[in-house]
């Protein structure tokens, strides 16, 4: 893996800060890569870390300010998204109360910070507002996981068709990789996911970005056969284009079947290696990776 580690260090775009309010200079090398995207998907390997949520918020600000994205699809709670959309457009309602009643992975100060930033921005630009993407009432929510994946993709497609907005989709890695036959473990559940439907619809206009990490609070270092074990050789926080020019042996590593972390609410650190995504390669699943070496827990709403 030495050659892959050397390539990562040569290609990595170092992040100067994870602070959502930091200047965008270090992100500007991404402009050309993301300029033509219709949907940029920020898929986190865990939705319970401060750093991955902060960098997702930072990328949201960049995409809105620099590349004209005007909708945020916050995966996981359609009712909460509808209330948050009303808040960011009109100021009606209490976003803290909405998120406190939402699904557990949305009950964080980091998500609330992003909501409040959108409202603040919309107040400054009342004629050019950022929206929360809303579920289409004609899309039947699936009961089985395969149906849920189709529904996630269909709602995204219909919102884009309805509004014409470029969309930042903030959700989970398992849903957003381009995974026609990816497997979620434990349980070894294999089915086509939302990201593969979105790639089919938008082609290169769908850009999946993996938000990954090596270790952190109550999470041991990545197993040696996980992609993160190699990604950890890069800077403390960076962006990597998985389709940049690479030597043949590095390209073989990028194209080889791999595993990545996948940490949900039932995660058990004593059985860390069991919680992973498999059934594809980094280069198949993702266009970009944002890797943070060390993470801590998100700040829960009180």
Enumerate the language-model features and the residues they cover:
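Structured catalytic-domain cores with a bias toward divalent-metal coordination
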Residues: 1-302
């Amino acid at each position: 893996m030495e050659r892959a580690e050397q390539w990562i260090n040569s290609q990595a775009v170092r992040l100067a800060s994870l602070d959502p309010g930091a200047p965008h200079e270090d992100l500007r090398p991404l402009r050309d890569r993301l300029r033509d995207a219709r949907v940029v998907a920020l898929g986190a390997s865990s939705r319970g870390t401060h750093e991955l949520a902060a960098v997702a918020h930072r990328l949201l600000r960049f995409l809105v300010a620099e590349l004209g994205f005007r909708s945020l699809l916050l995966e996981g709670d359609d009712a909460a998204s509808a209330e948050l959309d009303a808040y960011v457009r009109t100021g009606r309602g209490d976003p803290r109360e909405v998120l406190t009643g939402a699904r557990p992975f949305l009950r964080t100060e980091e998500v609330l910070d992003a909501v409040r930033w959108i409202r603040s921005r919309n107040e400054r630009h009342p004629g050019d507002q950022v929206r929360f993407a809303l579920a289409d009432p004609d899309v039947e929510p699936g009961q089985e996981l395969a149906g849920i994946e189709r529904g996630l993709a269909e709602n995204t497609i219909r919102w884009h068709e309805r509004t014409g907005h470029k969309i930042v989709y903030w959700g989970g890695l398992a849903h957003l990789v381009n995974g026609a036959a990816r497997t979620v473990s434990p349980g070894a559940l294999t089915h086509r996911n939302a990201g593969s439907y979105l790639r089919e619809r938008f082609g290169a206009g769908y850009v999946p970005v993996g938000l990954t990490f090596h270790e952190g609070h109550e999470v041991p270092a990545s197993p040696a056969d996980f992609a993160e074990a190699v990604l950890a050789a890069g800077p403390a926080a960076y962006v990597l284009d998985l389709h940049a020019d690479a030597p043949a042996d590095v390209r073989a590593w990028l194209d080889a079947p791999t595993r990545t972390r996948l940490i949900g609410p039932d995660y058990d650190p004593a059985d860390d290696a069991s919680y992973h995504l498999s059934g594809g390669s980094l280069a198949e699943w993702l266009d970009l990776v944002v890797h943070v070496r060390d993470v801590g827990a998100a700040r829960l709403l009180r």
